[in-house]
């Protein structure tokens, strides 16, 4: 199952060695897939490729999609049908992506198809607004193929993008903020972020409610 999941994350059909993204793929996407490990470092496995091919036949006979097909199949469909892709680019004038640090390659490819950088790729019928939110230091879905390098290269993909840094914590205790900051600085992205604590404490629930009301007012 993990072999099939990995192949689908990289948009690989049975027998494929590189992503089949079609003529509508953003420039350099196939090269990026190779950089990220596509084809997988351990290479195709003939016996598993046969199982994968049989699995796809059974899905087709059942008129079914599995979970990974919901994204990978959409990418293949849009890449193969430029008119359909253009219609969805017109339909979605603004796109919001939460937890961007946890997207995988197939999800990234879908975002790039629907919201290409029209300044670079000379496309004017596409999403005018793309807003993503995420933190590379909170990436937790690597076991499902996510790669925080996608959020780290966002400014490369969209060089005109504005960046808003959220540097206040409203829920963590001071000790947690301090410990997390030391860990991130020592071992992760080294982004140099300093998180400020913005957290009020109240003696009772009633006083907390009053404090919230005053803040809103």
Model regions and ranges:
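Coupling/switch/interface segments within P-loop NTPase motor domains and analogous charged loops
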Residues: 1-59
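Conserved N-terminal phosphate-binding loop of PLP-dependent enzymes in the Aspartate aminotransferase
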Residues: 3, 83, 159
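A residue-level signal for conserved active-site and pocket-lining positions in enzyme catalytic cores
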Residues: 4, 66, 133, 176, ...
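Conserved NTP-handling cores and scaffolds of large molecular machines
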Residues: 8-11, 55, 81, 118, ...
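Conserved helicase NTPase motor core
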Residues: 37-153, 165-172
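Helicase P-loop NTPase motor core
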Residues: 159-162, 167-217
